[in-house]
Amino acid sequence: MKWLLFPARIVARTRPNLFSLYRRSVSQYLRPRTIQNLQSMAQTPELKTKLFKPLVWIDCEMTGLDHVNDRIIEICCIITDGHLAPVKAADGQGDSHYESVIHYGPEVMNKMNEWCIEHHGNSGLTAKVLASEKTLAQVEDELLEYIQRYIPDKNVGVLAGNSVHMDRLFMVREFPKVIDHLFYRIVDVSSIMEVARRHNPALQARNPKKEAAHTAYSDIKESIAQLQWYMDNYLKPPQETESVESIGSEQPESPSSSTSSLKRQRTDF
């Protein structure tokens, strides 16, 4: 077999299919990277391992609670793993988060209810909204890019927060691309709080009170701390359940059978 040598390739005169296979196998390594791609790689933090069951904590400040007519004016996002550890900033200094204020004019802000006018005015949010230059579309794209930086795959990140079903209701209309990227389930810390109030009210009474600063960032930090408190003090850790073989082996009684049992007990007296 005779071979012809050329720079960067070897061609077989009688077996050209071998060269085709060789070219395909190495072409992925020989493609030049553009300067734009290199800059993008440098700006995006490299995750060597995927986040463990990531939670996408989001809190929105709105002009009211009418998801049809009111608007999201501030949004904040913190991403944690399933152990509630926040992702780190690109420079390694502190935790990473995304936060932005959307511009609306006086024609929108003056229509807020009294509660929003007072609290958003006192917190300085109203002034930030009027001064902001960012549109809703810009903020949606920025938030989606931020989430995809740490959670590139769709239907992986789970939306989390306090009464986060309300935030999601607004985001379905105003941040549809973000909602489409996230999993359909949510982790609503307020649901655990309502269960604790009924199941163990004495313990729930010792739950640290929220400061209610009503800024998106402070609300998320308090929500994460609140879920951590429940995990430390209310929910059973794995070491307390792994050794209990009977858990889940018995079928729970239906409400009707429980009621019948109580009636039988009462007739025995």
Swiss-Prot record:
Residues 245-261 have a biased composition (Low complexity). One of its GO terms (cellular component) is mitochondrion. GO terms for biological process: exonucleolytic trimming to generate mature 3'-end of 5.8S rRNA from tricistronic rRNA transcript (SSU-rRNA, 5.8S rRNA, LSU-rRNA); mitochondrial genome maintenance; U4 snRNA 3'-end processing; U5 snRNA 3'-end processing. It is an enzyme of class 3 (hydrolase). Its main location: mitochondrion. Residues 55-227 form the Exonuclease domain. The active site is at residue 184. Keywords: Exonuclease, Hydrolase, Mitochondrion, Nuclease, Transit peptide. It is found in: Mitochondrion. The keyword Hydrolase applies. CDD domains: Orn (cd06135). SUPFAM superfamilies: Ribonuclease H-like. InterPro entries: Exonuclease_RNaseT/DNA_pol3, Oligoribonuclease, RNaseH-like_sf, RNaseH_sf. Residues 240-269 are annotated as: Disordered. Its EC number is 3.1.15.-. Pfam families: RNase_T. 3'-to-5' exoribonuclease specific for small oligoribonucleotides. Belongs to the oligoribonuclease family. Present with 1730 molecules/cell in log phase SD medium. This is Oligoribonuclease, mitochondrial. It comes from Saccharomyces cerevisiae (strain ATCC 204508 / S288c). The gene is REX2.
